[in-house]
A protein has these predicted regions:
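N-terminal prepro-regions of secreted/extracellular proteins
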Residues: 1-70
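Mature secreted bioactive peptide module from preproproteins
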Residues: 48-153
């Protein structure tokens, strides 16, 4: 889930639940947020005695913010790795994040990535300040899950 907390200059709350591979949320100030899920199989490792394929699945969920001119302001990426025994189990084995700020009026805090079962979670907060006053806040709260077939969502 992605939540943008409005400031005095914003007109409404925007809550985003990722359902597709790529989504775009347009903000009332002309900026927009893009959320993209990227996935790939790393390798087919083995077959178990029940002939279930065992493989590693890697996924990234990238959240970017651009201003109304299309200039990149910031980016947050959740990286996740899953071990999948096809049709049997999926386990998140690694969860990390990265963030990059491109516009100097934004800052980042409270970043973290965790894993539990078949899901990776990423959180963090971007804030934009003008004359030392916070005018925009973007709270990142996203996840990547893997099913027993290696499908990421």
């Amino acid at each position: 889930m992605f939540t943008l907390t409005p400031s005095a200059f914003a007109a409404r709350d925007i809550e985003f639940v990722h359902k597709n591979k790529t989504e775009i949320v347009y903000l009332n100030n002309g900026s927009y947020i893009t959320i993209t899920l990227i996935s790939k199989d790393i390798s087919t490792l083995s077959l178990t005695s029940t002939d279930s394929a065992t493989f590693t699945k890697v996924g990234n969920k990238v959240v970017t913010c651009r201003d109304k001119k299309g200039n990149l302001e910031w980016e947050y990426t959740l990286f996740a790795e899953f071990s999948v025994v096809e049709n049997v189990s999926a386990t998140c084995t690694s969860a990390t994040y990265s963030q990059t700020i491109y516009a100097s009026d934004w800052s980042f805090s409270n970043g973290n990535a965790t894993k539990s079962g078949n899901t990776a979670y990423g959180v963090g907060t971007f804030k934009r300040k003008v004359l030392f006053v916070t005018v925009d806040t973007a709270n990142i709260d996203i996840s990547i899950s893997c099913d027993v077939y290696g499908n990421l969502s």
